[in-house]
């Protein structure tokens, strides 16, 4: 697969011109709006000066007008600043989507990206890790990729539960000597898992489910909130690799088959992935060779929302870091299914 060096060489030769042209188009929209806002603020100032001239003899009225216009001027300035700031973030986001798709195009000519699409809940539920009977599921940034006739997909996932909260509003009526209490009920979202779901196939077929759960029993918060919502089945398997046992708890109904699947080679590959990105990962190996990987606190959305300083120009370092993260996702398939 092409690497960062290849991409930066492509950037210097061709892509810089293509990206700059796209950024310039968005810049024009931003500066057009900026000019309108500046003109609007100048008009407020002119009206402000004219009113002072017209009502200058009446000091009380003048001071009142000055005060009101100062409030209006400050309010519109604040609103316009917020609008511009939001537009800058939106432009940064749009540019990042362009970069994301261009990097995918550079790495493969066969991919599908849909920003507001999630993996079908039925397919997600088939991996049998999180209990969707008691969890709410949301997703976005669905991406399907085909490299060297190997297909895989990934998307952002949010799994959460809700609990009812009560907010009290108290009012004391002195005339009747009565304390009125009003209860407002609302649902509070409690995130259980937020990260990336990655699904692929490996050549090494498995005869039963095998689950790798990150060893978090020293973390009371995770133990309390995550494990209650995991629905995996099987018995805990102790592998001969002590270091791997310290990182992951292995569950399966078939100890012999799980040991066959989790060979030293496969464990080394999983360790290699952990070195590339240290985020906690949950692995599900299915009977048909499908593998589901849940990467905690790693999302495409966070990558797309990262500020890219587009007004001064997108730097090579920024593009290189962006490429590394996308390349990592595409390399998961390459590493795990490496012969």
Describe these PLM feature segments.
Residues 1-35:
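Cytosolic juxtamembrane N-terminal segments of multi-pass membrane proteins
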Residues 6-12, 87-108, 112:
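Membrane-interface amphipathic/juxtamembrane segments adjacent to transmembrane helices
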Residues 31, 74-99:
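Transmembrane-cytosolic junction motif
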Residues 31-47:
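Transmembrane alpha-helical segments and their cytosolic interface motifs
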Residues 45, 49-57, 75-82:
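Short hydrophobic alpha-helical membrane-anchoring segments
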Residues 53-72:
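Hydrophobic alpha-helical transmembrane segments
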Residues 101, 105-108, 117-161, 186-339:
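Charged, low-complexity intrinsically disordered regions
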Residues 162-188:
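Mixed-charge, low-complexity intrinsically disordered segments
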């Amino acid at each position: 697969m092409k690497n960062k060096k290849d991409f930066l060489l492509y950037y210097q030769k061709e892509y810089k011109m293509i990206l700059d042209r796209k950024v310039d188009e968005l810049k024009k929209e931003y500066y057009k709006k900026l000019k309108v806002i500046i003109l609007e603020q100048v008009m407020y100032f002119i009206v402000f000066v004219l009113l002072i001239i017209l009502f200058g003899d009446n000091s009380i009225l003048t001071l009142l007008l000055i005060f009101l216009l100062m409030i209006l001027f400050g309010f519109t300035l604040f609103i316009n600043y917020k609008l511009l700031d939001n537009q800058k973030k939106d432009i940064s986001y749009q540019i990042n989507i362009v970069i994301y798709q261009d990097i995918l195009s550079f790495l493969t000519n066969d991919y599908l990206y849909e920003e507001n699409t999630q993996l079908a809940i039925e397919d997600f539920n088939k991996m049998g890790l999180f209990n969707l009977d008691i969890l709410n599921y949301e997703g976005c940034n669905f991406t399907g990729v085909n490299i060297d006739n190997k297909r895989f997909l990934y998307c952002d996932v949010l799994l959460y539960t809700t609990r009812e909260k009560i907010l009290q509003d108290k009012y004391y009526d002195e005339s009747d000597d009565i304390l009125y209490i009003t209860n407002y009920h609302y649902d509070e979202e409690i995130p259980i898992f937020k990260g990336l779901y990655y699904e692929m196939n490996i050549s090494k077929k498995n005869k039963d489910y095998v689950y790798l759960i990150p060893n978090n029993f020293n973390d009371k918060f995770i133990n309390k909130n995550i494990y209650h919502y995991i629905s995996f089945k099987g018995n805990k398997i102790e592998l001969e690799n002590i270091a791997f046992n310290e990182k992951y708890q292995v569950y399966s109904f078939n100890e012999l088959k799980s040991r066959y699947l989790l060979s030293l080679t496969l464990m080394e590959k999983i360790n290699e992935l952990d070195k590339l990105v240290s985020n906690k990962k949950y692995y599900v190996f299915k009977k048909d060779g499908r593998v589901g990987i849940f990467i905690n606190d790693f999302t495409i959305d966070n990558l797309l929302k990262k500020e890219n300083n587009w007004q001064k120009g997108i730097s090579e370092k920024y593009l290189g870091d962006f490429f590394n993260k996308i390349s990592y996702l595409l390399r998961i398939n390459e590493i795990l299914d490496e012969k």
